[in-house]
Structures are given as structure tokens and as C-alpha cells.
């Protein structure tokens, strides 16, 4: 896939408003990542307004990291509002296979037709109803083990499915792309996976979801590579990563994106 820089340039010029229903651990990090990248975050989650706000935003992201009954109401209301308004929305099924509560929530959100599903291999396997070895929010399965399940999930749900890990895999059920951008320090900072979901939402707001998701993964991963050049550990990496998201140019993204057809 060519032209990732064009996707980034358009996202920054349009600065889409992205409604983020994320978890307690991730909220500040997700907002700062979106701001650094050039989007506009809104952390609107209560059911009293989440559905109405979803029609105002250009995209919605829903993260299952710390669900509670009231937050679940907000998630479902927002997903319905986004669908009614024709807005793209991204599902991040955090630890969806860990408990019966999460499995039920994942199934209900999946029925509300997300535009994109972004998760690690264990989460995608669980959401697709396959056997998984997930450990809470962490994956114990390699990306390659989830590729067939991702394709089936994309076909059955109509969503673009992104399985993220050392080498990411994106599919719409017919096509597939692998993205090799990223750095080993990225999983050592909490909420970066949640933040990636926000970036996917920002790109999906302005481009077709398959191409937008692949471009978002390349952008996020390449920023991680750039940040690692100056970081000495996870703490300095987090600061450098925000700076890299802000500084990465469309031209640099075109040069550095490592995408190939799968």
C-alpha cells in the first residue's frame, strides 16, 4: 500500500474529533497521543450523552479495559449513536476472553457493527470464538495464530480487523496487509495499545477503514521507532513518543512505512 503520508496529512488538516470511551488507566495517555498526532480527543463516556455526542464526533472508539455497568451503558449508547449517524467506530476488546462478563459485553458490542476491531492476537481469537491462551489484557498467542480467525471475524462482522503485535496483520476478509513498524519498548508503556485504537479512529474518520487502519499502524509504529532512538528506557520513551508523533512528517512516513500485502 502506497501513500500513507497522504492519510497522515489529511488527518492533521481535518483534525477529526474522536470520541474515546477508554479505561481509567489509559484516559490521559490516549488524549495526549491524539493531540500530539493532530486529532482532537473527547473523553465522553456517560450514557446520558454518549449517544448524542457520537453523532457530533467524526469517529468513536470503545475500549473494554475497565468496564462497569454504567460505563457499558455508555458504550452501547455511543455505538448505537455512531451507527445512526453513519460515523465510523473502533472496538478494542480488551481481555474479552478473560471473564463471562467481558465475553458477553464483547458479543453485544460486536452485534452493534464496529467499523474496525483492533486487538492483540488473544483478544481477536476470543472475540472470534476460537481457543486462546490470553493472560488478562496481554496476549499469549502470536499474531500469526490469529490471522485465520481475524479473516473469519472480518467476514462475519463486516469490520476491518487489526491484530497487533510485533508484526501487525490487517484484513477486511478479502485483503490482508502486514505492518512491521514498531519497537520492543512500546509494550513496556501502559496504555499505548489503547492509544493506538484512538489513532486508528482518527485515521478512520477521514479514509476508508482498511487503508486507514494500515496507515495508522504504520504511523504509530514508526513514531515508536523514532522515539527509541533517543530513549533510555520506558519513562523517557513515553515522552519521546509523544514528540515523535508530533514531529513525524508525511514524507518521513512514506519513506519509513513497512507494509506488505499478506
UniProtKB/Swiss-Prot annotation:
Residues that hold substrate according to the record: 43, 191
Names of required cofactors: Mg(2+)
Keyword flag Thylakoid: no
Keywords recorded for this protein, A-Z: ATP-binding, Kinase, Magnesium, Metal-binding, Nucleotide-binding, Thiamine biosynthesis, Transferase
Molecular function in Gene Ontology: ATP binding; hydroxyethylthiazole kinase activity; magnesium ion binding
Pathway(s) where this gene product acts: Cofactor biosynthesis; thiamine diphosphate biosynthesis; 4-methyl-5-(2-phosphoethyl)-thiazole from 5-(2-hydroxyethyl)-4-methylthiazole: step 1/1
Keyword Metal-binding listed: yes
Domain of life: Bacteria
Binding-site list for ATP: 118, 164
Enzyme Commission code: 2.7.1.50
Reported function: Catalyzes the phosphorylation of the hydroxyl group of 4-methyl-5-beta-hydroxyethylthiazole (THZ).
Similarity-based family: Belongs to the Thz kinase family.
Listed name of the protein: Hydroxyethylthiazole kinase
Gene giving rise to this polypeptide: thiM
Amino acid at each position: 500500500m502506497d501513500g500513507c503520508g497522504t492519510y497522515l496529512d489529511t488527518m492533521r488538516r481535518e483534525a477529526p474529533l474522536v470520541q474515546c470511551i477508554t479505561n481509567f488507566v489509559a484516559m490521559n495517555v490516549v488524549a495526549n497521543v491524539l493531540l500530539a498526532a493532530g486529532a482532537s480527543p473527547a473523553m465522553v463516556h456517560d450514557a446520558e450523552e454518549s449517544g448524542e455526542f457520537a453523532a457530533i464526533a467524526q469517529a468513536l472508539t470503545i475500549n473494554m479495559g475497565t468496564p462497569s455497568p454504567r460505563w457499558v451503558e455508555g458504550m452501547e449508547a455511543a455505538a448505537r449513536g455512531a451507527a445512526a449517524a453513519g460515523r465510523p467506530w473502533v472496538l478494542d476488546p480488551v481481555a474479552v476472553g478473560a471473564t463471562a462478563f467481558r465475553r458477553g459485553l464483547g458479543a453485544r458490542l460486536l452485534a452493534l457493527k464496529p467499523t474496525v476491531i483492533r486487538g492483540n492476537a488473544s483478544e481477536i481469537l476470543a472475540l472470534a470464538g476460537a481457543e486462546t491462551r490470553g493472560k488478562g489484557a496481554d496476549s499469549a498467542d502470536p499474531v500469526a495464530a490469529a490471522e485465520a480467525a481475524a479473516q473469519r471475524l472480518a467476514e462475519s462482522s463486516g469490520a476491518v480487523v487489526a491484530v497487533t503485535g510485533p508484526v501487525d496483520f490487517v484484513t477486511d476478509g478479502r485483503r490482508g496487509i502486514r505492518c512491521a513498524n514498531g519497537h520492543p519498548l512500546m509494550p513496556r508503556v501502559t496504555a499505548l495499545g489503547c492509544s493506538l485504537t484512538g489513532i486508528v479512529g482518527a485515521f478512520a474518520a477521514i479514509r476508508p477503514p482498511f487503508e486507514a487502519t494500515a496507515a495508522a499502524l504504520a504511523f504509530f509504529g514508526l513514531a515508536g521507532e523514532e522515539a527509541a532512538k533517543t530513549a533510555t528506557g520506558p519513562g523517557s520513551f513515553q515522552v519521546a513518543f509523544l514528540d515523535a508523533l508530533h514531529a513525524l512528517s508525511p514524507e518521513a512516513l512514506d519513506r519509513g512505512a513497512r507494509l506488505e500485502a499478506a
